[in-house]
Structure formats: structure tokens, C-alpha cells
Amino acid sequence: MTEDARDLYLDLMKKVLTNLIYRDAPIQTFVYDGEPDADPRLLGRDWPSVAHTMVGLKRLDNLQYCVETVLADGVPGDLVETGVWRGGSSIFMRAVLRAHGDTARRVWVADSFEGMPEVGADSHAVDREMRLHEHNGVLAVPLEQVRANFERYGLLDDQVRFLPGWFKDTLPGAPTGRLAVIRLDGDLYESTTDALENLMPRLSPGGFVIIDDYAIDACRDAVHDYRGRYGISDPISEIDGTGVFWRHTAASARSLQPATV
């Protein structure tokens, strides 16, 4: 695939995944202070009724940057997303691999496919306050539907692997091997912590961590608590007012490895 053809393909994929082409009606729209005129679909500020992703165009641009950078730099490892909704961001990662002719890396698609876990007395306090499970009528997307969405783009193949179940159950033993990009979209404190604890030690130096829900207090607290525990100081960069990312350094990678005796 020529460079021009690759750029056209990936640009069209982003517009189709976000449905910027036909502009389906939102189920719900979120307006942030200072953004009264912002386009919700560019910034991921709505829950679309039809589109295959709610992350918005800017976060897909960032995802493309991260995946293409690890490909160009030869950073070893697969790609993983935790919390995939209708699958759009994971589909896009597979599209980037296809566009660049990468036939070795896999895309790991981790989700309960049942929506958000119900909170209880033993759940984190901030998670209890949000009660996101009450929105599972929108947030729960069955595995069969996500697989079908991959298939619609011609991207369901052996390079796509699914990890169905709650993160605390599936991620510790997930057979991912090394990772180059980890994209976390679990919203909750506990979901974010489960993903960081289990996936960060597998992330290759030079790889990327993307936090979709950093604007949510519970998620942001989980990120800073985790980084504080392990002394991670890699600079955090903002994407669009909601998501952030950072590049994993060799020093941070060493801090996550068990001490040798």
C-alpha cells in the first residue's frame, strides 16, 4: 500500500468509526466548561447511537500516532485495549496494522461484554458514587456484536484476540506476551488499577500508555496512585481534554520488574 493510499484509508476509517460521515444522533452529550461550541464527535463528548466508537476523532488521531510510532521505532509487542464498547478503537488499531503490512502483532480486545461491574460495599468509594453500571443499557455490548463489527470492516482474523470477562479475572493470566501499546478505557478506579497492575509490567520500553478516561476523577486517581506506587514519572501529555498518554521509558520499565536477590 502506498503512503497516500494508507493515509486515505486510515483517514476514512476514523471518519466511519466515529460516523462523522452521516452524523447519527447522540444518545447523550457531555458539555465541558469552556467548550460550549466544541464538536462533540471530534472530542468524544457524546454516546453515539450508531457509531462504533465514542472516543472522538482526536483520540483516534492519537491512537494512530502511538501505533505508527512503535511500528516505525521497532518497539516489540502487541496492542491491547481494556474496555472496548462497540470495538471501534480496537478495530482501528487492527486497521493501522493492516495499512502498514504488519502481520505479526496482535490486537487484544479485553472487555466484560456485559457493561460495567455493579458496585458494592467493598468497591472503591469513587466508583460507588458514579454507579456507571446503571447505564449498562448503553454500555453493555455483547461479544458477538463486537466480533461482527470487526467483520464489517474485513478486519476479523487471527491477529485479533478476545479476552472476555472482568479485568481482575482475565488480565493476570492473559497470554499477551510483550506489549507495545496499552489503551485503557475502563472508567472506574478498580478497572483502571486492574489493567495497570497487570499490563504495565509487560509494556516494552518505548511503548505507549493511553488513558481514555483521565478526566474522570476515579480513573485519574487510579493512574496517579499507580504511578506513585512504582515511582513512574514519565511525562503525561493531554490529548483532547479527556484522554492522556505517556511514553514508557526504560527507567519506568525497570521500576516494574521484581527485585533480584
From Swiss-Prot:
Binding site for Mg(2+): 185, 212-213
Keywords, ordered alphabetically: Antibiotic biosynthesis, Magnesium, Metal-binding, Methyltransferase, S-adenosyl-L-methionine, Transferase
EC number of this enzyme: 2.1.1.307
InterPro entries xrefs: SAM-dependent_MTases_sf, TylF_MeTrfase
Pathway the protein contributes to: Antibiotic biosynthesis
Domain of life: Bacteria
Protein name: 8-demethyl-8-(2,3-dimethoxy-alpha-L-rhamnosyl)-tetracenomycin-C 4'-O-methyltransferase
Annotated source species: Streptomyces olivaceus
